[in-house]
């Protein structure tokens, strides 16, 4: 047995040496990528400097993929491993824990890009109990051309940093490809800017970023599969929904079966078309010369079949409940007293992250999602709201320590009650009131917390109001609400948390 083990080890060693020698022989980098868009973007940047390999081919669902031992070995033998985001390739964090980072360089294509909150991607017939894919954050950024450019730029910059001797080639290749992506972005912007119908209905909820960046609204629909007809009950629901919203097209991630297309056309009066999520290309697609840009051009053409037709805004089948406690809608009876222990911990002000631009992506998202203010206007609004010179607050069950101008001031506090405030929008908030027992507390004598909760619970972040006059005087402050998050979070992590909520 020992001889066999030694023989196998020797053969493995010889194999690895052979692979290493092969890499040295052609002088090219060995880059392993996860799924199609990552492969395509990396290949375009690396060009002839690398052998770029695709790990997850057509026919394999990237959301559900788990790497085999062979695939892991392939990654471990690479010079560079490129993936999109851990919310897409959920297996990557475990892999990275075992990877020899001195040998294999790793690139996360999304880099510091913030992601929108995820959700359930409904696929399959819900009458059969099939479930979609859940993402904590939505990873489908490659389906927006303007964000695809950012992915390419990050791959370019990462490869250039890792292999500076090839930087000029990477930059030249990336520039040529980005020019094509900019033309694609322009085609989308011009093609959709005058959309008569801004809502589109899709069976695969992967197009949120595309919709957001080009002024559209994705409406996801559940209980449909491209290769199976819905039940009679589901078909009746769809028929009512389609007619009520005057829906002309329902988009699938692949061609719907002729039987399904005929059924939907006959019973619901709606046509089907394809919006390709570009998670893979088939061998036939590749042979036909298809690529990211050509498929995205087809997606635009398909979308315009909806956007070029007049119609009312299409509402989701199930309306989202926005009147939650977190948004300021609650009964008085739900409001309970709280103690300082709810806020115990070490906290940092978010104001420095606003100043250094870390939150700029958050303001861009808010501007596009709400349409109420521009990115610059949101930044100005939050600059006033977050402004403070208290950089840190450390809280125990009965004390608060304020770090201001590099100096620490610590006082003991008692709980003195709560106050429900009604805002101009009609929603409400609760402030929980504390008062220092120290005579020299000065501007920190009176303190109020607001954290979007109305009953005892451990705060994840909070807004704080403090002053030396009275609690009543603090009730009048509505424009400045210094905000604090745990001090072990990075600015990037805080920004992502803000988007999540």
Curated annotation (Swiss-Prot):
Lipid-substituted positions (S-diacylglycerol cysteine): 19
GO MF, one example: zinc ion binding
Bias kind Basic and acidic residues: ranges: 125-136
Region (His-rich loop): 120-136
GO CC entries: plasma membrane
Family annotation (InterPro entries): AdhesinB, Bact_metal-bind_prot9, Calycin, Lipoprotein_PsaA-like, ZinT_dom, ZnuA-like
Signal sequence residues: 1-18
Chain residues that bind Zn(2+): 63, 140, 204, 279
Membrane topology: Lipid-anchor
Gene3D superfamilies: 2.40.128.20, Nitrogenase molybdenum iron protein domain (3.40.50.1980)
Keyword hit for Metal-binding: yes
UniProt keyword terms in alphabetical order: Cell membrane, Competence, Ion transport, Lipoprotein, Membrane, Metal-binding, Palmitate, Signal, Transport, Zinc, Zinc transport
Region of interest (Disordered), residue spans: 116-136
Record text about domains: The His-rich loop facilitates the closure of the zinc binding site and is required for zinc acquisition.
Entry's family note: Belongs to the bacterial solute-binding protein 9 family.
Described purpose of this protein according to its UniProt entry: Part of the ATP-binding cassette (ABC) transport system AdcABC involved in zinc import. Binds zinc with high affinity and specificity and delivers it to the membrane permease for translocation into the cytoplasm.
Protein name listed in UniProt: Zinc-binding lipoprotein AdcA
Gene designation: adcA
């Amino acid at each position: 047995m020992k001889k066999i083990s030694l023989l196998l080890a020797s053969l493995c060693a010889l194999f690895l040496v052979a692979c290493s020698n092969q890499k040295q022989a052609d002088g090219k980098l060995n880059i392993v990528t996860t799924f199609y868009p990552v492969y395509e973007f990396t290949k375009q940047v690396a060009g002839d400097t690398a052998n770029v390999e695709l790990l997850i081919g057509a026919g394999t669902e990237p959301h559900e993929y788990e790497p085999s031992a062979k695939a892991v070995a392939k990654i471990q033998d690479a010079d560079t491993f490129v993936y999109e985001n851990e919310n897409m390739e959920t297996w990557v964090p475990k892999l990275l824990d075992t990877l020899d980072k001195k040998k294999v360089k790793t690139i996360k294509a999304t880099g510091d890009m913030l992601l929108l909150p995820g959700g359930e991607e409904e696929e399959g017939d819900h009458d059969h109990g099939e479930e979609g894919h859940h993402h904590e954050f939505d990873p489908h950024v490659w389906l927006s051309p303007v964000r695809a450019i950012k992915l390419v730029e990050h791959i370019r910059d990462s490869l250039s940093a890792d292999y500076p001797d090839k930087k000029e080639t990477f930059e030249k290749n990336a520039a040529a490809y980005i020019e094509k992506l900019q033309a694609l972005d322009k085609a989308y912007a011009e093609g959709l800017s005058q959309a008569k119908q801004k809502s589109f209905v899709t069976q695969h909820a992967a197009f949120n970023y595309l919709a957001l960046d080009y002024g559209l609204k994705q409406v996801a629909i559940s209980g449909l599969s491209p290769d199976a007809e819905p039940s009679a009950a589901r078909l009746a629901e769809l028929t009512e929904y389609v007619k009520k919203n005057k829906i002309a097209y329902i988009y699938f991630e692949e061609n719907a079966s002729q039987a399904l297309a005929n059924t939907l056309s006959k019973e619901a009066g709606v046509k089907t078309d394809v919006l390709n999520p570009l998670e893979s290309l088939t061998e036939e697609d590749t042979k036909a010369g298809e690529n990211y840009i050509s498929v995205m051009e087809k997606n635009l053409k398909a979308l315009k079949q909806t956007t070029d037709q007049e119609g009312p805004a299409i509402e989701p089948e199930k309306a989202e409940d926005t009147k939650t406690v977190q948004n300021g809608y609650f009964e008085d009876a739900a409001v309970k007293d709280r103690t300082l222990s709810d806020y115990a911990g070490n906290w940092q002000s978010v104001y420095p992250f606003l100043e250094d631009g870390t939150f700029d992506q958050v303001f861009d998202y808010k501007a596009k999602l709400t349409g109420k203010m521009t990115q610059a206007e949101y930044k100005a609004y939050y600059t006033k709201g977050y402004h403070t010179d208290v950089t840190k607050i450390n809280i125990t069950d009965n004390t608060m320590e304020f770090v201001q101008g590099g100096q620490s001031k610590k006082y003991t506090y008692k709980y003195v009650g709560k106050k429900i405030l009604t805002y101009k929008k009609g929603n409400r908030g609760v402030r929980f009131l504390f008062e220092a027992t120290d005579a020299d507390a000065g501007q920190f004598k009176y303190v109020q917390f607001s954290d979007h909760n109305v009953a005892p619970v451990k705060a994840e972040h909070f807004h704080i109001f403090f002053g030396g006059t009275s609690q009543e005087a603090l009730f009048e402050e509505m424009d400045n609400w210094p905000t604090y998050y745990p001090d072990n979070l990075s600015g990037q992590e805080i920004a992502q948390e803000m988007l999540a909520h």
